């Protein structure tokens, strides 16, 4: 448990890597040191300084765990309370949840969905148009999750859409009167 060594796979058809997500199976209440190696070649090596990984026992509630970075290796030091623990770069946002968000948002009269194309994996690239386009209205673009490891952006978009599509929110109604 004191010398688990891992490396991060490169993104699909790319030389970049930064994001990780894995499950540890072990005895509970035993201290572990998980070393993620070769990070000086990652997409953003400076991002590992003062970084804290996230962990979860149920894949719903995530919490931060202490880490140390020596310039090339990230050491996650943690004593799990249960036999199965999930670790990630940031709280994962599953493709299933992504599809649920798209399905939910298109039920609003203020939102429509368009397919712009496909990813390298053959999945739809979706555009959500929120509001009713009219001459004189401003057009605002918000992009998120353009890279595989940017799960935090989709969490932001989920909250953004919940607020923007809330029929009882005065600020959202005002924004949609002024912009699309």
Regions found by a protein language model. Name each.
Residues 1-180:
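M14 metallocarboxypeptidase catalytic domain recognition
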């Amino acid at each position: 448990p004191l010398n688990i060594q891992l490396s991060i796979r490169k993104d699909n058809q790319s030389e970049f890597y930064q994001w990780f997500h894995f499950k540890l199976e072990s005895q509970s209440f035993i201290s572990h040191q998980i070393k993620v190696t070769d990070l000086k070649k990652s997409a953003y090596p400076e991002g590992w300084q003062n970084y804290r990984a996230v962990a979860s026992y149920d894949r719903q509630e995530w919490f931060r765990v202490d880490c140390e970075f020596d310039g090339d290796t990230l050491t996650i030091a943690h004593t799990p309370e249960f036999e199965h623990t999930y670790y990630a770069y940031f709280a994962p946002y599953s493709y299933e949840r992504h599809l649920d968000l798209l399905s939910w948002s298109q039920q609003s009269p203020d939102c429509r969905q368009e397919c712009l194309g496909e990813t390298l994996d053959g999945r739809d690239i979706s555009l959500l148009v929120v509001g009713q386009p009219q001459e004189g209205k401003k057009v605002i673009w918000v992009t998120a999750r353009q890279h595989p490891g940017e799960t935090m952006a989709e969490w932001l978009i989920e909250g953004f859409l919940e607020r923007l599509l809330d029929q009882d929110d005065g600020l959202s109604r005002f924004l949609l009167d002024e912009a699309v």
